[in-house]
């Protein structure tokens, strides 16, 4: 059995299929783990979601910011942008089934026997594994409620929940978890989230900002963290316990697959149209 982890697919289904064929992926034997953002911008978000849904227990994903945005679009809480290429998905006959499947997915997954943790954007450095589990579970519980659109999705868009407060309750607590696990790139030196800078660290001109993974973290001492979201990194982090897998396929770059057991990365260049 092999465990394969894939970066932000974002509708780049042809590239995903190329990678899986290259490694002879077999869902009856292997598992495919995705760092989230299965949809948006790429040409085939519909096929991507259908494929992961069809994998059953052989497919594991976490929610990314674009996946959560899809829930808002389907709930008519946001307006679709043509550049996201989501119209075929939103108008698909099985959209209700796909949305229901998507909102059952968590914000974090772990592979305890390998001490691997996967989220979309990373893990706040001040969080322990127990806190990560707890906060992720609170969001998952809210997403599974029948009123999830009104109670959570309609109110999750906020840049105000940028600081971890273990005494927070209600929406602010859920918002921080969503912001941290699906949007985080940089933190200010005092530990609160920045939502603006997307550049790679070498190009960041604000001396008050540091990448989240440069802060001391007890969790990262004991576990390998797999994440995506930050395409500008192009997979380059100087820590063997960090696996940055978003390499910008939807922007014309690469889709990256990481074979856990071999600690090997395989890449597929964005395919040309036609």
From Swiss-Prot:
Signal peptide stretch: none
Record has RNA-binding as a keyword: no
Gene Ontology terms for molecular function: bis(5'-nucleosyl)-tetraphosphatase (symmetrical) activity; phosphatase activity
Reactions the enzyme catalyzes: P(1),P(4)-bis(5'-adenosyl) tetraphosphate + H2O = 2 ADP + 2 H(+)
GO cellular component: cytoplasm
Coiled-coil intervals, chain numbering: none
InterPro entries the UniProt entry points to: Ap4A_hydrolase (IPR050126), ApaH (IPR004617), Calcineurin-like_PHP_ApaH (IPR004843), Metallo-depent_PP-like (IPR029052)
SUPFAM superfamilies the record matches: Metallo-dependent phosphatases
EC number in record: 3.6.1.41
Keywords, comma-separated and alphabetical: Hydrolase
Superkingdom classification of source: Bacteria
Biological process, per Gene Ontology: RNA decapping
Known function: Hydrolyzes diadenosine 5',5'''-P1,P4-tetraphosphate to yield ADP.
Family note: Belongs to the Ap4A hydrolase family.
The protein's name: Bis(5'-nucleosyl)-tetraphosphatase, symmetrical
Organism per entry: Shewanella sp. (strain MR-7)
């Amino acid at each position: 059995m092999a465990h394969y982890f894939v970066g932000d697919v974002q509708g780049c289904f042809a590239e995903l299929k190329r990678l899986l064929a290259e490694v002879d992926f077999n869902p009856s034997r292997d598992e495919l783990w995705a760092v989230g953002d299965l949809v948006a911008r790429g040409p085939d978000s519909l096929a991507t979601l259908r494929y992961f849904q069809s994998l059953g227990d052989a497919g594991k994903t976490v929610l990314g910011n674009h996946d959560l945005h899809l829930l808002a679009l389907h709930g008519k809480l946001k307006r679709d942008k043509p550049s996201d290429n989501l119209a075929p998905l939103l108008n698909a006959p099985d959209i209700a089934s796909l949305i229901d499947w998507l909102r059952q997915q968590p914000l974090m997954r772990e592979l305890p026997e390998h001490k691997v943790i996967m989220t979309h954007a990373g893990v706040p450095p001040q969080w322990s594994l127990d806190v990560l589990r707890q906060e992720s579970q609170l969001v998952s519980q809210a997403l599974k409620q029948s009123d999830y659109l009104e109670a959570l999705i309609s109110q999750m868009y906020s840049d105000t929940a940028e600081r971890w407060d273990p005494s927070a309750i209600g929406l602010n607590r859920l918002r921080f978890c969503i912001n941290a696990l699906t949007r985080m790139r940089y933190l200010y030196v005092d530990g609160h989230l920045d939502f603006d800078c997307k550049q790679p660290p070498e190009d960041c001109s604000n001396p008050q900002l540091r990448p989240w993974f440069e802060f001391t973290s007890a969790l990262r001492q004991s576990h390998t963290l797999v994440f995506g979201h930050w395409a500008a990194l192009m997979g380059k982090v100087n820590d063997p316990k960090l696996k940055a897998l978003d390499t910008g396929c939807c922007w014309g770059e690469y889709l990256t697959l990481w074979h856990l057991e071999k600690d090997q990365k395989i890449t597929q260049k964005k395919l040309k149209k036609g």
